[in-house]
């Protein structure tokens, strides 16, 4: 939006706490998006009824009222932003903002103003506070002069706040002139009736529709799902969640492939909380072929006035369709269904693994969704690039019948979807290419010699893994050939060293220094005549090679010099582990190798200098060690 203004760190006010995000004002309206993804608010210019400025502690607040009766509060603006934004709105949007003042005197008497779904308490001409009537769960009179408002207490709003507003009481004298009454209908009752007309009250007594015994995978359990006018409730044996519809971002209806179940996912912002665990997605599993009939407990007047063209009196059909239609009508949330993608078995998803969990990866029109656990939604706009890889966890070579898909986000977060079947490759590659997402190894993915496609098309499970070879070339090898051969020959040991491994073992797997080419050639030529085939009829399989006994290492020998990459690894391993605690040791080693390869010569120079000092130390200790060994040989006969 080049014709407008763009601000970072602008917060959206509400009962859910202060959510920072990006604010954009342009000639066609305004937009706000939560930082890190999530809730998005867009208001067209034609829907705006009024705009107000207010000075609040440490910043300025921009208030926006809409034709639907909604009121948005954005704060975090500076004093110098007021004039520029005011001029822009007057010139390009034909809107003149009104300045309001905040009452800070501490008076608890004043007047009440109801504008749309907002209730403001004013002291004179200044505003003391305001509340949204959409957050009111119940309102009732106490005596003849008091009106009490009770607010929703759900499991989403205020999740990060220590305190939350529970109730609010107004005393309305019988002599009040703002809400005039009489002997039979006092002023407090007039105010109560005005609030009652704007708030969704009474909805907590009776649910509009109920679905019993529903299997929910996240948070796991069987729940009775009640849909009310302004919120839904999940009642289980051990848990009870209450969620306002304003917290629902979107609904997903995703059938399983070759399975009699369908996922219905409710995406929330803010998420619900269970202990210290946050659940941004509620994953419900319905039986695909189950048919139900439900009547809504709504009067014809309410349906006609509030839910016209959104709800019907009764529904009959597949249970997941009935549930999603009623929830969409009550909450106003949009529904996302499978995209044009089809797997090799004509399904909507491909089988894969994320972390330690098996599940389904759904390629959607605007993102990817992995279900059921952990439910992970990745939007296309958040993706930096994708990369096709043919290797298992930590780079271990596996069968060419599978490949991995790495998704790198713009915030440097990565998601690795493992063990996708080879026959899904072309459909997935064509879909990603059609969405114009950046493919990092595009040349390899398109079938270049030695690339992913070439390897996947090979039926030889022992084919060379180009990604694994690239990692090996990056990390180098500073150990002797004898130990390398023993390591490779052990088929059961295919992992990388752990954090507790010795430094010499780590050098063999992770070092990126120079190779001792001449010594390796000599060792290779000397070992060639020693390789013999196992005679037929032996215990091992035909063609197997007898393992050579490992040469005993002198404990007094000097420790080999550490390569520059190892110094870099030691310096960055802890930081990488702290920022990505879910990564396995082998994955950390891989990421360190990738970072090292992308570094410039200047960035590598400090580690190169450390390695050169260590090489000098190794050369000196080696010379002293060889001299001591020669003395031992010379003195050997005398000792005999």
Swiss-Prot record:
Region (Disordered) residue spans: 457-562
InterPro entries associated with the record: HMG_box_dom, HMG_box_dom_sf, PH-like_dom_sf, RTT106/SPT16-like_middle_dom, RTT106/SSRP1_HistChap/FACT, SSRP1-like_PH1, SSRP1/POB3, SSRP1/POB3_N
DNA-binding feature ranges: 558-626
GO molecular function, one term: nucleosome binding
A biological process from GO: DNA replication
Segments of skewed composition (Acidic residues): 476-487
Keyword DNA repair: yes
Cellular component GO terms, alphabetical: FACT complex
Keyword tags: Chromosome, DNA damage, DNA repair, DNA replication, DNA-binding, Nucleus, Transcription, Transcription regulation
Entry's localization field: Nucleus; Chromosome
Top-level taxon of the source organism: Eukaryota
Ranges of Basic and acidic residues composition bias in the record: 513-524, 536-546
Protein family membership: Belongs to the SSRP1 family.
Subunit composition and interactions: Component of the FACT complex, a stable heterodimer of SPT16 and SSRP1.
Role summary: Component of the FACT complex, a general chromatin factor that acts to reorganize nucleosomes. The FACT complex is involved in multiple processes that require DNA as a template such as mRNA elongation, DNA replication and DNA repair. During transcription elongation the FACT complex acts as a histone chaperone that both destabilizes and restores nucleosomal structure.
Protein name from the UniProt record: FACT complex subunit SSRP1-B
Gene: SSRP1-B
């Amino acid at each position: 939006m080049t014709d407008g203004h763009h601000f970072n760190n602008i917060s959206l006010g509400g009962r859910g706490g202060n959510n920072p995000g990006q604010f954009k004002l342009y000639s066609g309206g305004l937009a706000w998006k939560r930082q890190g993804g999530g809730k998005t608010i867009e208001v067209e210019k034609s829907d705006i009824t009024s705009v107000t400025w207010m000075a609040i502690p440490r910043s300025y607040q921009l208030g926006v009222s809409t034709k639907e009766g909604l009121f948005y509060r954005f704060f975090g603006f500076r004093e110098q932003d007021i004039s520029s934004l005011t001029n822009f709105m007057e010139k390009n949007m034909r809107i003149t903002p009104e300045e309001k003042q905040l009452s800070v005197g501490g008076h608890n008497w004043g007047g009440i103003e109801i504008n749309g779904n907002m209730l403001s308490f004013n002291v004179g001409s200044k505003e003391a506070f305001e509340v949204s009537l959409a957050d009111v769960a119940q309102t009732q009179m106490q005596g003849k002069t008091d009106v009490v408002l009770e607010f929703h207490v759900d499991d989403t709003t205020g999740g990060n706040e220590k305190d939350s507003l529970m109730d609010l009481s107004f005393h309305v004298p019988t002599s009040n002139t703002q809400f005039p009454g009489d002997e039979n209908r006092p002023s407090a009752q007039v105010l109560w009736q005005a609030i009652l007309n704007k708030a969704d009250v009474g909805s907590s007594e009776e649910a509009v529709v109920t679905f019993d015994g529903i299997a929910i995978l996240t948070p796991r359990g069987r729940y009775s799902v009640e849909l009310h006018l302004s919120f839904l409730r999940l009642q289980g044996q051990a848990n009870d969640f209450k969620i306002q519809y304003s917290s629902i971002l979107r609904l997903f209806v995703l059938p399983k492939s070759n399975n009699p179940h369908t996922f219905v996912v409710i995406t929330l912002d803010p998420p619900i909380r269970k202990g210290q665990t946050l659940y941004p997605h509620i994953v419900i599993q319905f039986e695909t072929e189950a048919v139900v009939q439900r009547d809504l407990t709504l009067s014809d007047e309410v349906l006609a006035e509030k839910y016209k063209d959104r709800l019907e009196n009764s529904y009959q059909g597949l249970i997941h369709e009935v549930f999603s239609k009623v929830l969409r009508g009550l909450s106003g949330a949009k529904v996302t269904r499978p995209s044009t993608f089809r797997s090799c078995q004509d399904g909507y998803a491909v089988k894969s693994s994320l972390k330690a969990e098996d599940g389904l990866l759904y390629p959607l029109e605007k993102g990817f969704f992995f279900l059921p656990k952990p439910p992970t939604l990745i939007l296309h706009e958040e993706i930096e690039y994708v990369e096709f890889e043919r290797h298992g966890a930590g780079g271990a070579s596996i069968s060419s019948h599978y490949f991995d898909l790495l998704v790198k986000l713009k915030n440097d977060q990565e998601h690795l979807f493992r063990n996708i079947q080879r026959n899904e490759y072309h459909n997935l590659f064509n879909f990603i290419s059609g969405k114009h997402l950046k493919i990092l190894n595009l040349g390899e993915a398109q079938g270049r010699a030695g690339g992913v496609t070439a390897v996947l098309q090979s039926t030889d499970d022992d084919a060379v893994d180009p990604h694994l070879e690239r990692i090996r070339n990056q990390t180098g090898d500073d150990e002797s050939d004898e130990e390398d051969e023993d390591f490779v020959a052990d088929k059961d040991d295919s992992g990388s060293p752990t954090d507790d491994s010795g430094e010499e073992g780590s050098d063999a797997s992770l070092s990126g220094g120079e190779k001792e080419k001449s010594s390796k050639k000599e060792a290779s030529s000397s070992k060639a005549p020693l390789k013999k085939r196992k005679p037929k009829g032996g215990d091992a399989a035909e063609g197997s090679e007898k393992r050579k006994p490992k040469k005993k290492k002198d404990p007094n020998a000097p420790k080999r010099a550490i390569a520059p990459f190892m110094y870099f690894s030691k310096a960055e391993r802890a930081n990488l582990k702290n920022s990505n605690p879910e990564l396995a040791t082998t994955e950390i080693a891989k990421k360190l190798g990738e970072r090292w390869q992308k570094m410039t010569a200047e960035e590598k120079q400090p580690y190169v200098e450390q390695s050169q000092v260590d090489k000098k130390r190794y050369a000196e200790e080696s010379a002293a060690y060889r001299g001591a060994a020669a003395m031992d040989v010379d003195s050997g006969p005398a000792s005999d």
